C-alpha cells in the first residue's frame, strides 16, 4: 500500500494498532452489554472478513493509508459489529421464547445451515439499509472541499460493508 503522508514510516504499525484497539473496544463493550464472554464472539466473527474486504478494496483502488483510512477502520468495525449484534439478538430472542440452542438445530423441518440463513435473511433488510445509508451519506463527504484526502474513509467503509 502507498502511504501518502509524511508519517509513512509509522503508518503501517499505527493501522495495526488502530485495528486491534477498535476490535478490543468493540469486544469489551459487547461483553459488558451481554454480560457474557461468549455472545460477543459470535457478534464479532464477521469483522475479519469485512476488514479483509476493506483492505483489498483500498489496495485495488490505490487508496493511501492515512488518518482518514484509520477512521474508516473504526467506522467499519462499528458497522460490522452492529450486524453481528442483530443476529445475536435474534438468537437470544429465540432462546427467550423457551427454546434451547439445540432446538434450533434439531428442528426436523429445517437444517442448521438453513436456520442460520433464515436469521441472516431476516436481518438483511437492516444491513442493506445501513449499507445504503453509509454509501449515500458519505457522498457529500467525498465531494466537498479536500475530497482527495478523505475518499479513503468512504472506499474503506463501502468495500468493507460490501464484503
Curated annotation (Swiss-Prot):
SUPFAM superfamilies: Multidrug efflux transporter AcrB transmembrane domain
A Gene Ontology molecular function term of the record: xenobiotic transmembrane transporter activity
A GO CC annotation given for this chain: plasma membrane
InterPro entries according to UniProt: Acrflvin-R
Family: To E.coli EnvD.
PANTHER family: CATION OR DRUG EFFLUX SYSTEM PROTEIN, PTHR32063
Listed name of the protein: Uncharacterized 17.3 kDa protein in cblS 5'region
UniProt source species: Bacteroides uniformis
Lineage: Bacteria, Pseudomonadati, Bacteroidota, Bacteroidia, Bacteroidales
